[in-house]
Amino acid sequence: MPPSNGPLGVGMDDPLVTLKTDVVIEPLVERWHAWAHLVSPVTSSLNAKYRHLAVLESFVTAPSAHVSACQNPKLRGGPFVDLPVSEVGAVKALIESTKARQAKQIEFGDALRESFRMIMKQADGFSIEPLYEQLPEPVKGYVELTYTIGGYPDLRVNEPLLYLSPAYNRSVQSAAIYRAQGDDRPFAFSTPKMPGPNIFELEEPFDSQVYDYLARLRHYPQRRSEVLAALKVGSDRTDLVSDFLTEAPPATLKPSEKTGKTRWRYFGHACVLVEAPDGTNMLMDPVVAYEGKSGVERFVLSDLPERIDYVVLTHNHADHVLIETLLALRFRVDTIVVPAGGGSVADPSLKLMLQSIGFKNVIELDSLGTIESGELTIKALPFLGEHGDLDVRSKAAWFVRSGETTMLFAADSNNLDPVLYDLLRKAVGRVDILFIGMECAGAPFSWTYGPLLPVAVDRKKDQTRRLNGSDCEKGLKVVKSLGSTEVYVYAMGAEPWLQFITSIDPSEDTAPATNARQLVEACQTMGIKALRLFGKADVTI
């Protein structure tokens, strides 16, 4: 897409410009970093009150305690607002804004929680039909009361209908635009992005075309005056936004080439680009870094192909579905492939969420569902664990065939039942290359799902139901079952640009790092090529 107003250098008073490579466009929901649970109506409604308001009110009550906790590395990732005491007034204003702007969502969330408590108390195995009359008004018509086959009461939501209701609130969607100061950011789950003199506020919902305009502006120059007009920049913010822009020629986006070979590139964490011999490509769990000064080598957005045939998502956690990167890629993506969901409160639809933020072509695949395109095959495989034993079905490991090479992207799959991988070997054959995580010391499940629970979980039980992936022993069984000849440990959250959403301790003496090292060594002892990935990698087969 060439610039519409002539070549670089024309019009010195109105030059052609692009975004600087360190400019962050961070999507926000009522000032909180936007992750999928803050877009989907049910989870957004419950998080507004039971996560956001709860932690903000705690900060206002004891700001010094929060400041002290945030200075302790062992407490990173905890419910502590990483703001100075001087921000108490601004936080009080955010509390009032949240209560006003998200009032209908909070009302729905309270009604949903009340409905759950009601059926837990009153549904005793007899017909559940009389309980519909007791449902609070905000949820009537949006929920179905059921029993599980084991006789336990449950509640399901009509999620498509909720996107047409007040529980879905586009008006609280916006973005903060600023220049990155290295890779460090406050922990996104507990600290809102407050306004500041170096931040430009973009008051547009995520489905707005302005996000595509900004994404293109990273690669295709436009007149400076057009950029200021497109962003509706007032005279008092012109200098700030101008600092986001550069006249330096941008990196050129290149198409995937027909090389006759398979190439894969690791972009950090669980993000891997696969290019098939005929040039068909897919991008797994896109989380792409900005230009950084941390010393960690990295690929950036301009290293991706000009067109991305398939974006494939493994599961609905913030470090695998990063809306910030997805919006930066939206204009380049043909199709997004996601695991089909189950429709429970803890399992919002990835397809509906992505469609609501402007993605037109989203395909859901059930287990063993397959897409074939040229020399690339993508198949959904079962993904056990890592969700605190909740009935979450929006998760898949992905089997990929690129030319004659087979791969499995297992992400955070926990090998709870090794027989599964024996069965998968029969279903898909030997897997040449295994990508598997070793995050075997995850947080208690309430860390992510606590705001969704109708009643608080017992702490001892919570500690046993962790968001764990496989450890070395379990991972080694996967390797043996699938007959893999290459093994790559990934999805460890160790890259510095992941810390603001994972809060994972990147040191080498942790249980995940130890298990990753043990798996690599065990594989190498068996003559299997093995490596723990970090930062970037580029492999042609």
What role is predicted for each listed range?
Residues 291, 317-321, 343-346, 367-372, ...:
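Active-site environment of divalent metal-dependent phosphoester hydrolases
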